[in-house]
Every structure is written in C-alpha cells, then in structure tokens.
Amino acid sequence: MSLNSNIEWTDATWNPVRGCTKISPGCKHCYAETFAERFRGVKGHPYEQGFDLRLVPEKLTEPFLWRSPKLVFVNSMSDLFQPGVPDDYIEAVCKVMVKANWHTFQVLTKRSERLRELLSGRMRFAAKQEHIWWGVSVEDQKYGLPRIGDLQETPASVRFLSIEPLLEDLGAFDLSGINWAIVGGESGPGARPMLEKWVISVRDRCYESRVPLSLIHI
C-alpha cells in the first residue's frame, strides 16, 4: 500500500493484484505498465515480473493495518475484474473492503460487464456498502459509453466515472445514477491531445445532471 498517492483524486493506493492487459484505446499509454516494466528482471523488486498479471495475497490484509481513515484507490496498478483474476480472489478483496469500513475504497475497472455480473450476484454483499465506490473508465464513445450503462445496471450505492484519458467528444450520454465524475487528459511523453470543447461538453452534461465533476490534467 502506498500512503502518499500522486493520484489527485485519492489519498492512498492498495494493490492486491499487479499487472494487466490492454483492452481499449485508453490503455495505450498506461502509466502503470510504463512504471512496472522499468523494473522487469530486477530481483526482489515488487515488479520483477514487469506488468505480468500476479495475485498478491500477502497484501490482502494491509487496509487493517492502516488505522487512519483514507480514500483508498484499489488496484492502481491493475484491474480487479480482468479475466485472469479468479472470482474467489475478487470476493476476498471485497470482504476486506467491507470489514475495513473506516476507509473509503475506490474501485475502478474497464471490465464493466464482469463488475455488473459479480456485484449483481455473489458479490452483492459489497455492492451496497456506502464506503465502497464502484467506477468505470470512459475514454471514448465506442468503448467507454457502454461501460456507463453496465455501471448503471450495477446495484451499487456509489458510482463514479473516470473519464480519462478523454480521447474524443462523448456526445450526449446518460448520467442517471452516477454520483461523481472525473475528467482529464493524458500526460507524459506521447500524450494524445484533449480538446477543450470535449471537456466543456462533459462539464455541461454533469451540470445538467447535478453530478459533481473533478478536472485533472487539463
């Protein structure tokens, strides 16, 4: 767990899973992959295996050791709902979050279909916890907007959108049931441009729907 996160919208990170695979354009310049691959082959380093998927069960209980309440971004270096993570392991992560209820957990995924299926079924016990926020990444219309629909169909108490990197105008989209949104562009070498009018469009949609909006990397 990192107690001092550089991510603007959270306090800390917790990574019981490491590594991921690309599934959509938003993954192209993945900061987590870039960081992890720097240490591939470095013996003893947490990312000795680079960005290959790895379960880290020894990290599961870390939130219990952190007594001061924090906003905790779950799996900043992975995606909890990717296919290689077993249902049983996801359930174990959910049980920790439910018990460590002095923290507020932020769970973000691009695998929105699996999120919806599990939280509507065996993980329903975690879905309605007000201290667990469930979110999806949205970068464009083709891949991002369907994730919003999946999230809206998920029986969660708190739903949020990470609209970053914003790669095109999202047009008109429904924000019913969404509690918070973040919008931002890419940063670093090779960052793809984000147009001001795209951000204004998202801002206007949030204003009309009374959804709080955080702007980053503008």
For each feature predicted by the language model, list its residue ranges:
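Conserved small/polar residues in nucleotide/adenosyl-binding loops
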Residues: 216-218
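N-terminal [4Fe-4S]-dependent radical SAM core
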Residues: 1-72, 79
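Conserved AdoMet/S-adenosylmethionine-binding subsite of the radical SAM
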Residues: 55-212
